[in-house]
Amino acid sequence: MTTVLAIETSCDETSVAIVKNRQVLSNIVKSQINIHSFYGGVVPEVASRQHLEIINQAIAQAFREANLDWPDIDGIGATCAPGLVGALLVGLTAAKTLAIVHEKPFVGVHHLEGHIYATYLSQPELVPPFLCLLVSGGHTSLIYVKNCGEYETLGQTRDDAAGEAFDKVARLLKLGYPGGPVIDKLAAEGNKLAFSLPEGKISLPGGGYHPYDFSFSGLKTAVLRLVQKIEQEGNELLSGSSVTKDIAASFQETVAKGLTKRAIACALDYSLNTIAIGGGVAANSSLRQHLSRAVESHNLQVLFPSLRFCTDNAAMIGCVRLVGH
């Protein structure tokens, strides 16, 4: 199998891609950010209806941009879990229907497996075994990739995901949704050492801390209390103010350092020389800087997906369909 049609509708992006080997011939992404930003987050029912309205035109556009037709397609893949149930149903129904009509083999693809494979699209030297730091709006995990389709979760968040923490802190700072890009932008102009914020740690029953697990709820609460203190002192938090930029920078620095420290420790403990990053937070500039510096001192390698493959997209689902199945 060399050429696949892939569909991704797990949350608020309707994406259809055609992938040949590791070459992305088309990758259509219809974002719903402008719709959901009004509500401060994704509304599941609204997301499902939007997917339903544009899925057919996204499929047609993918074929046009790839300059292919159905006889050129060898198989179909679609995200099957995890995600919003109604949103997933739209993509799965479309994919399965097309598979029946055009007599193409169909495979359901796990969304997180897609993020793991996203790095393959732009980093052909990536081969198992390696450690994947998967950081998104719904998940934060350290995954030992032993082989294609063979995984072991070594660490994960015990509460909020990293991307979710970015969204919640952005809401506290009145920056809107989604929080990741705007915090990253403001942090570049702020002082990352302005505020001391706690790095989340998971205590073990016998004492000490879990070396690979994450926690962001305490950090989020610390930012909330900091914002309340500033407002009680009569200061208004504005998106362009220096204090808002400093909070954004301090928060982002704390998250990036925590993610980096655990990823490096995990890779060293398991004798894994390569760390691959996946998920929307993989686009964060501070995380990329911290990891790039850290691997140099430990003789490790870190590989990032292209920025266009960090957020949800069907190309990564197509890559799983080709490489992993």
From Swiss-Prot:
Keywords: Acyltransferase, Cytoplasm, Iron, Metal-binding, Transferase, tRNA processing. The keyword Ligase does not apply. The keyword 4Fe-4S does not apply. Gene3D superfamilies: 3.30.420.40. It is an enzyme of class 2 (transferase). It is found in: Cytoplasm. GO terms for biological process: tRNA threonylcarbamoyladenosine modification. Its cofactor is Fe(2+). GO terms for cellular component: cytoplasm. Binds 1 Fe(2+) ion per subunit. Required for the formation of a threonylcarbamoyl group on adenosine at position 37 (t(6)A37) in tRNAs that read codons beginning with adenine. Is involved in the transfer of the threonylcarbamoyl moiety of threonylcarbamoyl-AMP (TC-AMP) to the N6 group of A37, together with TsaE and TsaB. TsaD likely plays a direct catalytic role in this reaction. This is tRNA N6-adenosine threonylcarbamoyltransferase. It comes from Trichodesmium erythraeum (strain IMS101).
